[in-house]
Amino acid sequence: MIRRPPRSTPLYSSAASDVYKRQGHGASYYWIGKAPSAQFFTALPFGLNAQEMNAWLHYGGGLELWEEAYDKFNLIPLAGGNTGVQMAGWFNKEINSLEDIKGTRMRIPGLAGKVWTEAGGEAVLMPGSEIFTNLQTGVIDAAEWIGPYNDQTFGLHQAAKYYYYPGWHEPGPTLEVIINKEAFASLPSDLQEIVRTASRAVNQDMLDEYTARNNQALETLVNTHGVILKRLPDDVLKKFKEITSKLLKELIAEDSLSKRIFESQENFKKNVSEYHKISEKAVYEMRELN
């Protein structure tokens, strides 16, 4: 079951497609109730990382599919930020096996929330502003937010002491800029291009900032605040991956656009992963040599 805790408020009270609204900024997976395919444009569990996501959107046909998905809502989507690989979350208990997932109430949205529920936990939906209080008071047992840079600012280390990785649920989460189509069309072509270019610049700048700041924040969390950094067990990650595959098969069987998007993303991931084995991965391994 996925539920809202008491006193929670809707994440969005109105859509940018309202003729009186001009644009918005958020994450597409909050819209999966209206558009199941929206999940693909934030992040998929075990999916593309930030570098791959940007490449797929801008050079692999992803942006065109995103535009198609939002067309019926009278919206133009643009990538407007990426925080890089996220942390798996904050927990008030250790996760040593699948048994520890059972009954654990966790703030985790999107497809990952459904995975968590199928694994025996309970996914809870709430805006970021409510995470600290609900985690501190025991309304929830765990929460994912973003990563060390943001999580430290939110004070989440004061509400739970176990900090888990890897971020299986959001390996490369993209934020979106959504623009009313009529409002965008009213701009001259040069200003339209400025908007697109500015959004793309912000998208990359956010990733640069998080890459620079996350480790500094993590060192403070661990060395100053005594946070206990832990890795999720392999059997837990394997189960999450198995459930993710099952849920995606169900989704693409019900929604033809989701099927096309998924196939595009999977083919792109397969191709770039082959090269990454001898490039990105090889460099990481090389740097570990003594």
Residue ranges of each PLM-predicted region?
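N-terminal secretory/targeting leader peptides
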Residues: 14-53, 61-63, 68-290
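Single conserved hydrophobic/aromatic residue that forms the stacking wall/gate
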Residues: 1-16, 20
